[in-house]
Regions:
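Hydrophobic anchor at the beta1->P-loop junction of P-loop NTPases
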Residues: 156
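N-terminal accessory targeting/assembly segments
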Residues: 1-101
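Hydrophobic positions on the alpha1 helix immediately C-terminal to the Walker A/P-loop
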Residues: 167, 171
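Conserved lysine of the Walker
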Residues: 164
């Protein structure tokens, strides 16, 4: 398997004092956590790492570990908004901003609520930067066992940070070399489109619906692109399930991911789960083990 990181693109957003330590870590970072007046935390899968007073990476946390100042939190926020906060207001209210390269920055603070809806987030106090990574070949085992010879309806399930998006990205690359694929990339994490061009390899015959909601993307893809299969990440709402079922009824295959801890969880949440041919349950990183279930045997 070949791993491709976009760390160089990502490092530019961080305060200068922190860039060298992040760059020195090299590949392998999965998350970078910044909190106001708290130590910067570098996550390597489940390992929690810190930066000591000499700029070195350490597993030990003490009073000398590098802390993120309030000024650096504000600087990082303006950097990821490209100094135009109002342009990202909708993303901010949704709780995340997607950067070039497909990296996603989750943010938290104090919600401003009007009419039962979040209209702004003020006093932002923390960020979780999820590092986007292409792992070419990661999806080959699933592809060879499920899609050998014909397309199937497949659900990729797992806990948060279990690698669902990375698996989907590689399956998209593989499927897009043989079939007409429509990719609904609501958060710009899979293809990482920048200036209209996917930065990640999602297959030569893949049409990317970048920034579309899953419901809108599914409806549009079915209507205008005649796909053999539609791929998208993190199905969850009843509207999305409804459009998935509609696409299946139109003879289009679906390959989607879902947050789920067990097969029983999936059965409870998706009434038409038997319409899927296979369910793939992912284990936790870094082992990335998975189990493939045939729904007609469940």
């Amino acid at each position: 398997m070949k791993t491709a990181d976009n760390m160089q693109d990502l490092i530019q957003y961080f305060p200068e004092r922190l860039r060298e330590s992040i760059a020195a870590f090299g590949n392998g970072l999965t998350e970078i956590r910044l909190r106001r007046e708290k130590p910067i935390i570098l996550m390597r899968n489940s390992d929690m790492l810190f930066v000591d007073s000499n700029g070195k990476i350490t597993k030990a946390v003490d009073s000398e570990c590098v802390k993120v100042t309030s000024a650096e939190i504000d600087s990082f926020f303006y950097a990821i908004c490209r100094n135009s906060v109002h342009s990202f207001q909708e993303d901010i209210c949704s709780g995340f901003i997607t950067l070039s390269g497909g990296h996603r920055v989750g943010l938290c603070g104090t919600a401003v609520v009007r009419g039962g809806k979040i209209t702004n987030i003020k006093n932002i106090n923390g960020f979780n930067v999820r590092v986007s990574r292409e792992i070419i070949g990661l999806g080959e085992d699933i592809y060879n066992k499920i899609f050998c010879g014909e397309l199937k309806n497949v659900l990729i399930a797992g806990a948060p940070a279990s690698g669902k998006t990375t698996i989907l990205r590689d399956l998209c690359r593989l499927l897009g070399s043989r079939y007409k694929v429509s990719l609904i990339d609501e958060r710009s994490e899979i293809a990482a489109v920048y200036s209209g061009v996917p930065q990640n390899d999602v297959g030569m015959n893949t049409d990317v619906f970048d920034g579309y909601s899953k419901a809108d993307g599914l409806e549009t893809a079915v209507r205008v692109m005649s796909p053999d299969i539609i791929i998208f990440d993190e199905a969850g709402s009843q509207d999305e399930f409804g459009y998935m079922e509609h696409a299946m009824n139109c003879g289009i295959r679906i390959c989607a991911s879902i947050h789920a801890s067990s097969i029983e969880d999936i059965k409870r949440r998706i009434p038409f789960w038997k319409s899927f041919d296979h369910i793939v349950m992912l284990g936790k990183l870094p082992k990335q083990e998975h189990r493939i279930f045939r729904t007609d045997e469940l």
